[in-house]
From Swiss-Prot:
Keywords: ATP-binding, DNA damage, DNA repair, DNA-binding, Nucleotide-binding. GO terms for biological process: mismatch repair. This is DNA mismatch repair protein MutS. GO terms for molecular function: ATP binding; ATP-dependent DNA damage sensor activity; damaged DNA binding; mismatched DNA binding. The gene is mutS. Disulfide bonds: none annotated.
Length: 855
């Protein structure tokens, strides 16, 4: 210990020792009933948690140091706030009883909590990325629910893949350059680790699971063990003895799911609305689950819809059976309503963090699981038969908990009052002593009087001597030899016996020993329960599936939804379809039909803003998605084809912070769609081309439609305000025009929200502006200008560098720039340039011209 540390108080010297070991963490240092933060940590804690910043002496000749603290019993609330802000928190705990400590209390860092490892709250999980060529080896571990998966993902698909999981922290090799968008789009906390950490993690993973290779878990790429090992080792290194049960890793196989990239998830507003509101999301509106397991299963299924007719129909069959057997559905819901989140209980119990009450919750939930198994025996659907056969009877675990713990135990495990009478004979004896101390002493006193014949003998107590036997001087001659003298008084002698000392020890230490013994018995119970947690986890997964299916059934009953026919053909036909989210919050919702066929597979939908174009095309996407989850739909009838992907381009989801213009964002999205869509895909395009000039937008939109028609053949819905696109119906195969109907009145227009064949009569932009409340003067002026523009027939907008007259008027710098652009255009090899590449070239040229003109 250096001179500087010697000058510190012993407690602060101990603090410095641990802080030096965890310099990148906020160190919560246990002092009595508080966790304290010191120095810079205190300043951060005060700012982030709104705590009062105080100070304390640091040692002889030293200035006072900043400090602030939080009560230990509510520390998790404060830790959650820090972790959500991206901080790591090290917990430095007292590891011995302060009352028994000789000198300063022993402390140790028992756990490090990071954004991806705070499993007390369902805040998210931990991910590891390990680059291999043009792909990433990805692992995801969610400690709160025991989910551990791995996959090999192409670099261009990485963001879409990660967006399916609730990831808070990413582990990477030190110096690893991640895709630029990753942190900004997904808002992740990055933790860099040395290369050796990945190698050592791999060895630790294989050793702990007792396998020579991760191929034993079903993985094909051996290098994935580096990524899996990193998250595994990181979790164990940070959580130490509190590490929850980590299941064996499983391969993530996406071949069985409809592809939904991040744009589709945002565009269809699956987990949150475009404005970021979760209460307006599809998930929130359709959720009728009753357990945490079911809720997570529903969310996962919405993000990973089935791409298998067989799996969809099995779910539909189960949903339909529950609808037809309403009493059974009610019984299932009644059973699930009181069930705890078993996946989270497994995590907490295995990490030694579960309270006695949580074990009671486990007992009650296991009893309910057995009730559920009996209810499922009343059903005939294949899924329910499979689940019934796979649900394990864990009454033995429930019985053990029931036999050991009282029905309403205290919240904290060391408070006593946990264990039922009859579990442990010594505990029963201690409790009897505690509750009958005075009676026991009187009985012993009576026994001694009888043995000695000294009727004046009495047992007394003081703080100095403890319990004693007092005999008057006149009766000393009758005292037995086994009495040991303790004290002489003027008129009496005080004695003790071995039996009295044993009784005294039991009485005085009874409560302490009761608490210690109850804690030991609780730990033994927990260890027995931990042995069965794999089986509990198995049941949790199955119960989540039941909850997911009953949620679909209850929703269909509640809303009057109809079973769609999901088929392997091409046509998509919806009769009187509704958007489930918009219908939820709208009175007198107007349903619409959809008919996409091999002959008419591209629908160009025109109409003014606010007429319902965007809502309608999203509606088709949402209904298609729901059908692939096995859900019934808000329709009169529907034939939904199996799709391999749903693509959307809806501009409101642009991430402008990336420094890319709206137009470039749009072109990148369209490029992704045109490069990856197949004939089995569903494409939803909303106002493509609005990020550039009118004629550029029209040209690009026409080229996109033509490419989809000729090269892809995917079912496509294109909402646009460009009426010029409607001429494609005559020129391009598969195009059909539709519009959102508007009624014109003397007061203006009225939106009918009805989809009809044909093109819109006009854009009605000025009418919409009037409805929006623009001043009458502005509306009149706009109408006047519109008439003037409409009168200038034959005039067309052209780019300046194509006009000979303009060339003559520009200065030399501009002329050189335009000639350079023209030269580049002339050098384009049209024969070897795909439409997608042409769009990107056009977008780049447009950006350069815009930048030059602004100069």
């Amino acid at each position: 210990m250096g001179k500087e540390e010697k000058e510190l108080t012993p407690m602060l010297a101990q603090y410095h020792q641990f802080k030096s070991m965890y310099p990148d963490c906020l160190l919560l240092f246990r002092l009595g009933d508080f966790y304290e933060l010191f120095y810079e940590d205190a300043v951060v804690g005060s700012k982030e948690l709104g705590l009062v910043l105080t100070s304390r002496p640091a040692g002889k000749g030293r200035e006072r140091i900043p400090m602030c603290g939080v009560p230990y019993h509510s520390a998790n609330n404060y830790i959650a706030k820090l972790v959500n802000k991206g901080y790591k928190v090290a917990i430095c705990e007292q590891v011995e009883d302060p009352s028994k400590a000789k000198g300063i209390v022993k402390r140790d860092v028992i756990r490090v909590i990071t954004p991806g490892t705070f499993f007390e709250r369902e805040t998210g999980g931990l991910c590891s990325l390990y680059r291999k060529g043009k792909s990433y080896l990805v692992s995801y571990l969610n400690l709160s629910v025991g989910e551990f998966i791995g996959a090999k993902v192409k670099e261009e698909e990485l963001i879409d893949f990660l967006s399916k999981f609730n990831i808070r922290e990413v582990l990477v090799k030190k110096g690893e350059k991640l895709p630029e968008k990753l942190e900004k789009v997904l808002k992740l906390h990055i933790t860099e680790l040395e290369e050796e950490f990945f190698e050592e993690g791999k060895e630790e993973l294989l050793k702990d699971y007792g396998v020579p290779s991760i191929k034993a878990f079903g993985f094909q790429d051996e290098d994935l063990s580096l990524s899996l090992g990193a998250v595994y080792r990181y979790a164990k290194a940070t959580q130490k003895s509190f590490t929850p049960l980590i299941p064996k890793p499983k391969p993530y196989v996406d071949e069985g799911y409809v592809k939904l990239d991040l744009k589709a998830v945002k565009g269809l507003e699956i987990t949150e609305s475009i404005e970021g509101r979760k209460d307006l999301s599809l998930f929130k509106v359709v959720d009728r689950t009753l357990t945490g397991m079911g809720r997570r299963r529903l969310r996962f299924r919405l993000l990973n819809p089935f791409r298998s007719i067989e799996r969809i129909r099995k779910v539909q069959e189960a949903v339909e059976e529950l609808i037809n057997k309403r009493e059974v559905l009610n019984e299932i819901r009644k059973t699930l309503e009181g069930m705890s989140d078993l996946e989270r209980l497994v995590s907490r119990i295995s990490s030694n963090m579960a309270s006695p009450r949580e074990l009671i919750h486990l007992k009650n939930s296991l009893r309910k699981a057995e009730e559920l198994r009996k209810i499922l025996s009343l059903l005939d659907s294949e899924i329910f038969k499979e689940i019934e056969g796979s649900l394990l009877n864990l009454n033995k675990v429930a019985d053990l908990i029931d036999k050991t713990l009282v029905d309403d135990p205290p919240l904290h495990v060391k408070e006593g009052g946990l264990i039922k009478p009859g579990v442990n004979a010594y505990l029963d004896e201690l409790r009897f002593i505690r509750e009958n101390a005075e009676k026991l002493l009187k009985e012993y006193e009576k026994k001694l009087k009888k043995e000695t014949g000294i009727q004046s003998l009495k047992i007394g107590y003081n703080k100095v001597m403890g319990y004693y036997i007092e005999v008057t001087k006149a009766n000393v001659k009758y005292v037995p030899e086994h009495f040991r003298r303790r004290q002489t008084l003027s008129n009496a002698e005080r004695y003790t016996t071995e039996e009295l000392q044993r009784l005294e020890e039991k009485i005085l230490s009874a409560q302490t020993r009761i608490n210690e013994l109850e804690y030991e018995l609780y730990r033994e119970l927990r260890e027995e329960v931990v042995k069965e947690l794999d089986k509990v986890g198995n049941n949790a997964t199955l119960i989540g599936e039941v909850d997911y299916i009953q949620s679909l059934a209850w929703l269909a009953l509640e809303k009057g939804w109809v079973k769609p026919e999901v088929h392997e053909g091409y046509e998509l036909i919806i009769e009187e379809g509704k958007h489930p989210v918009i219908e939820e919050f709208t009175k007198n919702y107007v349903p619409n039909d959809t008919k996409l066929t091999e002959e008419e597979f591209i629908h160009v939908i025109t109409g003014p803003n606010m007429a319902g174009k965007s809502s309608y095309i999203r509606q088709v996407g949402v209904l298609t998605l729901l059908a692939h989850t096995g859900s019934f739909l808000p329709v009169k009838s529907a034939r939904i084809p199996l799709v391999d992907a749903i693509f959307t381009r809806i501009g409101s989801g642009d991430v402008l912070a990336l420094g890319v213009s709206t137009f470039m964002n749009e072109m990148l999205d369209v490029s992704n769609i045109l490069n990856n869509a197949t004939k089995r895909s569903l494409i939803i395009l909303d106002e493509v081309g609005r990020g550039t000039s009118t004629y550029d937008g029209i040209a690009i939109s026409k080229a996109i439609v033509k490419y989809i028609s000729e090269k892809i053949g995917a079912k496509t819905l294109l909402a646009t305000h460009y009426l010029e696109l409607t001429e494609l119906e005559r020129k391009v195969k598969g195009v059909k025009n539709y519009h959102m109907e508007v009624e014109e009145t003397d007061e203006g227009i009225r939106f009918l929200y009805i989809l009809k064949e044909g093109r819109a009569k006009g854009s009605f932009g000025i009418d919409v502006a009037k409805l929006a409340g623009l001043p009458e003067e502005v509306v009149r002026e706009a109408k006047k200008i519109l008439k003037e523009l409409e009168g200038e027939k034959g005039k067309q907008e052209v780019l300046p560098f194509l006009e000979e007259t303009y060339k003559k008027s520009v200065d030399e710098e501009k002329l050189n720039f335009y000639e350079e652009i023209i030269k580049e255009i002339e050098e384009i090899d049209i024969g070897n340039t795909t439409p997608v590449k042409a769009l990107l070239i056009l977008a780049e040229l447009k950006e350069r011209i815009k930048s030059f003109i602004k100069r």
